[in-house]
């Protein structure tokens, strides 16, 4: 007897459809799973056997072969349990499922038959939707997440016995059991019967032809001795909430307002520019000047994710097993990731035999914050160079090459020197570092990486006697309004191009939309010679100037915009030793 169900697995962060083929044949009772399964999948044979028997069904006393197709793709995880169990029950004639060809099945089985949620449901269901599937059967714990994909009917299962339906006839074993408080535990009288059935299922006593399910003989399949239950899923239909939080709701970071930050008006200006064009930014200053505090407020001035971006980000978090509160809908706030400086390179960009998403992919469409950047291992920082340039992470393994999205804004902070007090301006906090030690400290961040950071901003220590430093200045709402207006201009300008922000301009599009004009070009070329700027720095200054012009509502870049952009290249200047 042959049957086929449909499931899915993760391959990187993408869902891949997997056919679960079940074959029952005469022979020694055993279950064999083939198709490059990992250990968790091979162990499914024991989980499914126990779950099927403990819920009143009969496990076939035949040679059970389960093939996961395509067979040349390595499969991982426990998401195939439900499809394997339903495949065995339908192939053995205990259930009939007319909609099996258009229903995706995902879920891990416990030994008592209950369903446990699995990770990566969202990309799996998206793959099924693209393949033409109409419904998904999965654990109730994943139902809210599954409902985020439109066009798919979601059926939520708490327990394998729920597949019988409220009016389906029970099997002979189920008739001899007493369900107490919703459990599948047998009574004392039924215990011996269940034990005998278990022995039969293991091939210890009964013969093959006495089984209550169809078996193939020389004259063809026989009729089942027990009632066949038609599997109707309507009683399992999941109804999603009528509405989810609006995309226009303020981000979590808006609870902490920039109006709380006294002074530092030029830093707020730099952060506004960075957010408007999604430019990389590095804040440099002594301890206690508010670098970390201001960057942590940065998500509050960024517009919420669009519907397309929200689905993209939510799928990445689902694949990484980090999707929380799926009942609230798609992730609408831009991600803000802040890994510790002890993180490894694999943790930052992703790793594993089948790589999982790293921090740069989890920060996709949002912000990756590296606090105290020089404390990160240099080799770890260097892995950022490719994703900062290409906006993707490419990881090569023996079996395949994986490409993950990594379109994020890099925000960093650092002290100006090893002791941290260079330029503090306080007589009791004088820098004790020599010029060579300052240079050695700053060299922990390589020149090519600094080249990819558009804004390098000094954050001085506020002076108590400076009235301007004690004023609150712009609030988060005001900065957010300016950023939204600038990004709206960019969206209109690049509506026919595969880019969203000024920071993504390159080549001919950069020359077209960020033309500095004759006067601006002369200014830039003179600075290229005096400061030794690279052509990459030249291009990034143009991108920054374009964003400054957008914030001013200007159609063309002026020399004033270029001059302001040049002020944010502080690390291009040599450090000065305090006397």
List the model feature ranges, each with a label:
Residues 40-45, 60, 67-77, 354-355, ...:
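Basic, amphipathic alpha-helical bundle interface domains used for macromolecular binding and assembly
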Residues 283-322:
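Walker A/P-loop
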Residues 18-24, 348, 454-458:
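Short beta-strand elements
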Residues 285, 350, 372:
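The Walker A (P-loop) glycine that initiates the GxxxxGKT/S ATP-binding motif of P-loop NTPases
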Residues 365, 371-372:
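Walker B catalytic acidic pair
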Residues 1-281, 396, 538, 555-579:
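Peripheral, non-AAA+ core regions of ATP-driven protein-machinery
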Residues 339-360:
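Short glycine-rich substrate-engagement loop in P-loop NTPases that contacts/grips substrate
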């Amino acid at each position: 007897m042959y049957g086929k169900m449909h499931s899915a697995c993760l391959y990187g962060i993408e869902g891949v459809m997997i056919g679960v083929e079940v074959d029952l044949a005469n022979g020694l009772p055993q279950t064999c799973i083939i198709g490059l399964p990992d250990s968790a999948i091979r162990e499914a044979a024991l989980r499914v056997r126990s779950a099927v028997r403990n819920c009143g069904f009969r496990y076939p006393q035949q040679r059970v072969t389960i093939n996961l197709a395509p067979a040349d793709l390595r499969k991982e995880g426990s998401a195939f349990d439900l499809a394997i169990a339903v495949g065995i029950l339908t192939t053995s004639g205990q259930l009939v499922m007319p909609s099996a060809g258009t229903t995706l099945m995902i879920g891990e089985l416990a030994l008592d038959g209950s369903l446990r949620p699995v990770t990566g449901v969202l990309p799996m269901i998206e793959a099924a939707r693209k393949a033409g599937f109409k419904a998904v059967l999965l654990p109730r714990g994943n139902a809210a997440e599954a409902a985020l994909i439109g066009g798919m009917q979601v059926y939520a299962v708490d327990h394998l016995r729920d597949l019988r339906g409220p009016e389906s006839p029970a099997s002979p074993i189920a008739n001899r059991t007493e369900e107490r408080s919703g459990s599948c535990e047998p009574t004392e009288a039924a215990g011996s019967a269940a034990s005998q059935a278990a022995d039969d299922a293991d091939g210890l006593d009964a013969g093959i032809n006495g089984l209550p399910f169809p078996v193939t003989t020389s004259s063809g399949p026989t009729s089942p001795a027990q009632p066949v239950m038609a599997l109707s899923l309507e009683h399992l239909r999941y109804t999603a909430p009528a509405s989810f939080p609006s995309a226009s709701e303020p981000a979590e970071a808006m609870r902490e307002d920039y109006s709380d930050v006294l002074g530092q008006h030029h830093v707020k200006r730099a952060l506004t520019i960075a957010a408007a064009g999604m430019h990389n930014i590095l804040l440099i200053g002594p301890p206690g000047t508010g670098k970390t505090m201001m960057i942590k407020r940065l998500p509050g001035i960024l517009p919420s994710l669009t519907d397309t971006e929200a689905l993209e980000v939510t799928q990445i978090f689902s694949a990484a097993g980090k999707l929380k509160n799926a009942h609230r809908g798609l992730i609408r706030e831009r991600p803000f990731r802040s890994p510790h400086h002890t993180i490894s390179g694999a943790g930052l960009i992703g790793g594993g035999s089948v790589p999982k998403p790293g921090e740069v992919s989890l920060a996709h469409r949002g912000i990756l914050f590296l606090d105290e950047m020089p404390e990160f291992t240099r080799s770890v920082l260097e892995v950022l160079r490719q994703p900062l340039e290409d906006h993707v992470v490419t990881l090569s393994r023996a079996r395949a090459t994986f490409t993950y999205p990594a379109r994020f804004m890099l925000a960093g902070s650092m002290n100006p020197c090893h002791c941290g007090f260079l330029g503090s301006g306080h007589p009791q906090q004088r820098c004790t570092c020599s010029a060579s030690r300052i240079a050695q400290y700053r060299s922990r961040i390589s020149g090519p990486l600094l080249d990819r950071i558009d804004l390098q901003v000094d954050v001085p220590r506020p002076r108590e006697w400076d009235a301007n430093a004690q004023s609150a200045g712009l609030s988060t709402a005001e900065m957010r309004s300016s950023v939204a207006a600038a990004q709206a201009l960019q969206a209109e300008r690049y509506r026919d191009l595969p880019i969203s922000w000024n920071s993504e301009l390159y080549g001919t599009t950069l020359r077209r939309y960020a033309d500095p004009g004759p006067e601006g070009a002369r200014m830039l070329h003179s600075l290229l010679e005096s400061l030794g700027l690279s052509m990459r720095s030249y291009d990034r200054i143009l991108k920054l100037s374009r964003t400054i012009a957008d914030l001013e509502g200007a159609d063309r870049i002026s020399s004033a915009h270029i001059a302001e952009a040049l002020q944010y290249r502080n690390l291009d200047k040599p450090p000065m030793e305090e006397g």
